[in-house]
């Protein structure tokens, strides 16, 4: 048995798949490619596969990562080629590497993500540098985060530590934001967008699309993709 870590995309055609549906699409691709997989034991065996994150419905991603335990003698390159031959539109294997047999769950170590949120603007003459300055310069921003279980007040700047950057084209603005993912929680890019609209008067609407540009492991040495680490 060997453990492979693969980078996959979630393209536009899969935007409205939930994480569960996306995971099932990946498993179907593996079955179609006839990859011999290791399975869990018990009454309901399932493929030994784990994801770096749970992508929300409506979010695309430049790269999602999976760890998978395979019972194959085939090379990594051949396995990736077999998967891509049967991949559905919007899903592609972008790269991979063989990992040590025992690695940490990626969901436990991936703690930083870069998002691009794009939507229409209501003022094409807006100065986005000036509009973003109060948000980017604040040391603390209180926000009431509502979940099905409870409502709690969080400090947005605990999670959005770097300046948000705006680019405008054809009546649309793209806000690029780096967001920390910590044991105590995180903030959604949609929540940052709506907070900017409601509290900082950014000239945007409630309509937007979200693309996750990267998910990474951040430590004292820097930021790395899951393919750049060995744990």
Where are these regions (language model features)?
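Ordered, amphipathic secondary-structure segments that act as subunit-interaction surfaces
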Residues: 62-116
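Ordered, soluble secondary-structure elements with a strong preference for glycine-centered loop motifs
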Residues: 15-20, 73-78, 125-129, 183-187
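Extended, well-folded interaction surfaces typified by the phenylalanyl-tRNA synthetase beta subunit core
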Residues: 2, 7-9, 13, 17, ...
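Short beta-strand-to-loop capping motifs
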Residues: 8, 68-74, 117-123, 177-181
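Short, charge-patterned binding micro-sites
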Residues: 38-70
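Core RNA-modification/binding signature centered on pseudouridine synthases
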Residues: 133, 137-231
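Short amphipathic alpha-helices in soluble, non-transmembrane regions
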Residues: 79-87, 127-137, 192
